Amino acid sequence: MAKAPVRKPKKKVCVFCKDKAAQSIDYKDTTLLRKYISDRGKIRARRVTGNCSQHQRDVAIAVKNAREMALLPYTSTAR
């Protein structure tokens, strides 16, 4: 019996690099930053979000600043 062909996963493209003028990463933009936080309150990994290394670093810094300013929670409220 023949094996099924192995598919490579589709490469994710950094949304910030793709559309440069659309959005900048700012700690006050909580709706954007919530997309990069898991339901447990952790910052999602690069391989999950598809961001490039520079923009992933910027997102992480913005999330940490927003947490410090009490705009985002450190942990989730779900139990």
Swiss-Prot record:
It comes from the Bacteria. GO terms for cellular component: cytosolic small ribosomal subunit. SUPFAM superfamilies: Ribosomal protein S18 (SSF46911). Binds as a heterodimer with protein bS6 to the central domain of the 16S rRNA, where it helps stabilize the platform of the 30S subunit. PANTHER family: 30S RIBOSOMAL PROTEIN S18, SMALL RIBOSOMAL SUBUNIT PROTEIN BS18A. Belongs to the bacterial ribosomal protein bS18 family. NCBIfam families: S18. This is Small ribosomal subunit protein bS18B. It comes from Saccharopolyspora erythraea (strain ATCC 11635 / DSM 40517 / JCM 4748 / NBRC 13426 / NCIMB 8594 / NRRL 2338).
